Amino acid sequence: MGPLLVWHRGDLRLHDHPALLEALARGPVVGLVVLDPNNLKTTPRRRAWFLENVRALREAYRARGGALWVLEGLPWEKVPEAARRLKAKAVYALTSYTPYGRYRDAKVQEALPVPLHLLPAPHLLPPDLPRAYRVYTPFARRFLGVEAPLPAPEALPKGPEEGEIPREDPGLPLPEPGEEAALAGLRAFLEAKLPRYAEERDRLDGEGGSRLSPYFALGVLSPRLAAWEAERRGGEGARKWVAELLWRDFSYHLLYHFPWMAERPLDPRFQALPWQEDEALFRAWYEGRTGVPLVDAAMRELHATGFLSNRARMNAAQFAVKHLLLPWKRCEEAFRHLLLDGDRAVNLQGWQWAGGLGVDAAPYFRVFNPVLQGERHDPEGRWLKRWAPEYPSYAPKDPVVDLEEARRRYLRLARDLARG
């Protein structure tokens, strides 16, 4: 019989990988990545970021003496094909909790000539907790501490290599791909920024945060390892940052238990908001031409870099939903495809939270003032000057809507729906 296949999906790394270590304990392994067309229907920047991290994973296999197969096609065709060609005894992978991941894995299992072993992915809290939580705080109370992460293997058995990894022009500069770069970025954040994270995490320029989200999105960096290292250092910054990592797991938990939240609000009452199918208004928001400085700076930075701070994301999303009443699902999807860290579960949670559509205890009647938000979280205006230099301050300039009138309109509509 041949080797064991380790199928990498949203876990493009060797460290803290239970499926890889379990397979290695049972025999020689060959790694596998399938370039799934269902996941590659996105922007060039996101395809390029994914492909460069697959390339880095192959180099990590090679550096340890191992081999990574890369096949292009549907997983329920290509995983069985790889298993047959290698005469593999079994396939090992980490559990996926997304609706598509569960569908894909069921189809692969049905088509495979050998067993598919799915091991728990190293989340801080498993997304498939039996009780379905809609509010973050009781979910987070289930967290009792971080389990120790697993080490990366020092060596891998030799094996055949198969498949080419295509190149894609991202159209913008990418971060350094691969887990070595991710681990270096983690160390730099823990040493330089974690001590002040609690005070600086809301900066609009994102310089108070880790900027590790593109690595988390592809599983290049294990959140369990990141939380473990943060907790070792301790302090209020570590506590706050681990809480943010728990929000990621809460996002997966929500989508696991409420898969329909990808199509409609978690609170169904707000589906009936009079969404504005206004193409000119959508383009103004999407392209950063609203006349509202914070929103315009946010969308321009996102287009130029593929990154945006959490505070800027919340403001851009809430403005689209509450001030403009743009169809939230269209905006969420367009926004996600610009993000290098575009993660469906995380982005859906973020948009439904910011939009007051039923996630967590965020009240629908909370409406950010983008002028005050800018002045509070970019007090010297440096971020604004970089991304929207035509604005001398955070005061609107010929805005597409009057901020106060739009706020009152939304509150009137939302209150009527909330009262039933």
From Swiss-Prot:
Belongs to the DNA photolyase class-1 family. This is Deoxyribodipyrimidine photo-lyase. Involved in repair of UV radiation-induced DNA damage. Catalyzes the light-dependent monomerization (300-600 nm) of cyclobutyl pyrimidine dimers (in cis-syn configuration), which are formed between adjacent bases on the same DNA strand upon exposure to ultraviolet radiation. GO terms for molecular function: deoxyribodipyrimidine photo-lyase activity; DNA binding; FAD binding. Its EC number is 4.1.99.3. Its cofactor is FAD. InterPro entries: Crypto/Photolyase_FAD-like_sf, Crypto/Photolyase_N_sf, Cryptochr/Photolyase_FAD-bd, Cryptochrome/DNA_photolyase_1, DNA_photolyase_1_CS_C, DNA_photolyase_N, Rossmann-like_a/b/a_fold.
